Amino acid sequence: MKRISILLLAATSFAVPACSSDVSTSGDDTGSGSGSGSGSGSGSGSQTEWDQVLGSRVTDYSAALRVASLRLNGTLPSMTEINQVASATGDAQRIAYEALVRDYLSRPAFANQMMVFWRDTFKMGGKITVGATTVDLDTAPAFAAKLTVDNGSYMDLFTKATGNCPTFNAGAGTFTDAECANAGPKAGVLTNPGVMAQFFSNFAFRRVRWVQETFDCLRFPAELGTTPTDVGGAAPYLGVWPFNSIASPTNGGGRVNFQDVSSAICANCHQTLNHIAPLFAYYDGTGAYKTGVISVPTPLDKAPPAQLSDYLPPTETTAWRYGKAAADIPALGMQIAADPDIARCAVARVWNFALGKEDIVDQLVDVPKETTAKQLEAFTQNGFKMKDLIFAAFTSDAFVKF
């Protein structure tokens, strides 16, 4: 539903100018997302030619070993390791290579590499000072890195109720469990105080955007249907939620007009944003949860705090997606974990890490579904184990062939 085709995207690019820069131009997931295409514009980049190029690659475990060692341990392989692979022949070379990859995944250096990976992925790390409070921005990356090193379930990122703020000893490459001390509900990184502080903003929209882009690999608008709705603007509304499901001064008494159609159709993005953001609105600028007190500002004069009526009319409830209600953040985490696109995004991010690609959202480096179908199936059927997924990526044909 939300992964629209490039034709629909082109047809609607002028319909949603406020959100158009947030739509991936990678289209129907069959391209790299780089926007450069494969040919000169004269038809030179045919599928047959790509097949020929891909078919001409040869397996080179020695070259793969160098890349794997750098990615997974941050250093080049030792001469002993190089010779283990180089001196083997036939299938023994594959076995030697895979054994070394497993060894790399067991070393303390791998934990350090995962801290770097998750800091980059989460766009956070170190510490910040908010007023008189120092907030640790490393506990969310440490939680994800520990989960990866322990070969835990990726879905614990959204559902785990304890031990969500571990510390990391870089010298030893070890983690120590710790509880988050910001009160409120507990649901993996979704309730992490560092996340809440790092992405504090008007209406808590930056927090929602972080969740959306990090774990769904897609910019807003996130839910686009195929049937445009005339809402009296210069362009139609393309969302799947009813247009009146979000607030405005004339629909539920909201103080901001999220139903504005004078230029952009704001509801294309806010249909989803407004159903999630209230759940994150109770965390203040330090990431502390304030029970019953909305603690994020609005862009209105004198920055008054947001109100529930600003987001939704009284008949609406919070939700992850249309038809996927979530009354609180733990329920939101369960809905996120059950969304197939979340697993696909995880596989795509690991794939891009292995292949040395840039961020899937920031640089539009999408991964075609067909490319990672085998890894996604194994990931889903094997309990979403992160270390197993990384091993699968680093031993795939795409990684070992050059």
In which residue ranges do the predicted regions lie?
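Sec-dependent bacterial lipoprotein signal peptides
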Residues: 1-18
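Ser/Thr-rich, Pro/Gly/Ala-heavy low-complexity intrinsically disordered linkers and tails
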Residues: 16-54
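N-terminal module-boundary/linker segments of secreted carbohydrate-active enzymes
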Residues: 43-78, 83-88, 104
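Surface-exposed intrinsically disordered loops and tails
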Residues: 50-56, 91, 168-177, 225-257, ...
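N-terminal alpha-helical segment
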Residues: 61, 78, 97, 368-372
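Flexible, low-complexity segments enriched for small/polar residues
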Residues: 66-73, 81-86, 102, 119-123, ...
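Alpha-helical oligomerization/assembly modules used to build nucleoprotein complexes
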Residues: 87-97
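Extended surface/linker regions that mediate inter-domain or inter-protein docking
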Residues: 95-276, 337, 341, 351, ...
